[in-house]
């Protein structure tokens, strides 16, 4: 989905992988463009039937790999599920970064930017993937 792996460089539907000159646009503008692109897709009848959290479903993904040689590869991948707010005026919070102010977590009734650092680390894709990889490392003999 959009913005995918290009999230840091996302510059709207015309430049989903970033501007040709490589310049970045401000994050608040990226957030506006992403909400508008989602709203336009939904208004045009985009198929959202496969989205498990409804038509505004979104997730962050973190994958980590520990490579200790050809026969010793360990992978951890985790997600944080949420939804994208309907309008930029619904953005909230000053914590976090990137899309956090528009990434709403229904189970907390907050955006990711409204969570404390401790709350976010407990549920974030990065926190979960890191803890999983630490468990893997702790179980490996002869690192």
Tell where the protein language model's regions lie, with residue ranges.
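Anionic-ligand binding patches
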Residues: 1-143
